[in-house]
Regions:
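Short, glycine-/Ser/Thr-/acidic-enriched flexible segments
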Residues: 39-41, 75, 86-88, 101-103
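FAD/FMN-dependent oxidoreductases across multiple families
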Residues: 49-95
Length: 235
């Protein structure tokens, strides 16, 4: 895949190479293997100490003795919230800047360093434009209706039938769908299948149960609410 650059190939080339191997059946349990054993224990301890710890803690793998199962991971999705060149969205007064925004400069491929334009150039433009505009605008108070709507959604989740499925299953299926159809390789058919699946998951999400009914630092509720936002973003 990169006979000249070898292990120094760009993340773009490496990601496509890994996914091609997996898709064509040469992977192992949905991964390819990264072997560091030839470097020797001393080099691994001195120069790859963080990777040594992460592989041990999260994958249960000792990279001094066995290869690491790897696969392409989502850093961030190229093409986010649609904005103009000043970071202004379709919602008056709402800006999006940096890696969450899409100014339509780049395509869908996440190449090294192209986030600098998003963050440094358009991030600054957004800040300057927002600073200028805020001097000309008055601010409205948050309406009771907006707060009531959010509270009603929280109460609905807390009251859902305990027989409903847990948020983790829906979240896992969402991740698998996005990884399969909207990651390294994309086509129209796959994206249409993903959209249909996301809409199915949104319907199932309405019946998701929150096991912890507490109202203080309820992480179960927080993760469930986050899943709703993830489904909206995915759609």
């Amino acid at each position: 895949y990169a006979p000249n650059m070898m292990e120094l190939a760009s993340r773009d080339v490496v990601s496509r190479s890994e996914q091609t191997e997996i898709d064509e059946g040469r992977g192992i349990d949905g991964c390819v293997l990264l072997d560091c054993r030839h470097l020797g224990e001393q080099v691994i301890r001195e120069k790859l100490s963080q990777i040594l710890e992460i592989a041990r803690d999260f994958a249960g793998v000792d990279i001094r003795k066995e290869p690491i199962p790897i696969q392409p991971g989502m850093h961030y999705q190229m093409g986010g919230i649609k904005t103009d060149i000043n970071g202004l969205t379709a919602v008056p007064g709402l800006y999006a800047a940096g890696e969450c925004a899409c100014v339509s400069v780049h395509g869908g491929n996440r190449l090294g360093a192209n986030s600098l334009l998003d963050t440094l150039v358009f991030g600054r433009r957004s800040g300057e434009h927002a600073s200028d505009q805020v001097k000309k605008k008055s601010f409205a108070s948050v309406t009771d209706a907006s707060a009531d709507s959010d509270l009603a959604n929280i109460r609905r989740l807390l009251k859902n039938d305990d027989a409903g499925e847990m948020f983790g299953r829906v979240r896992q299926e969402l991740g698998q769908t996005m990884d399969k159809h909207l990651a390294v390789y994309r086509n129209q058919q796959g994206m249409e299948e993903a959209l249909a699946k996301v809409r199915e998951l949104k319907e199932r999400y309405r019946q998701v149960r929150v096991q912890d009914k507490g109202k203080t630092f309820n992480t179960n509720l927080i993760f469930t609410l986050e899943l709703g936002f993830m489904l909206d973003c995915a759609e």
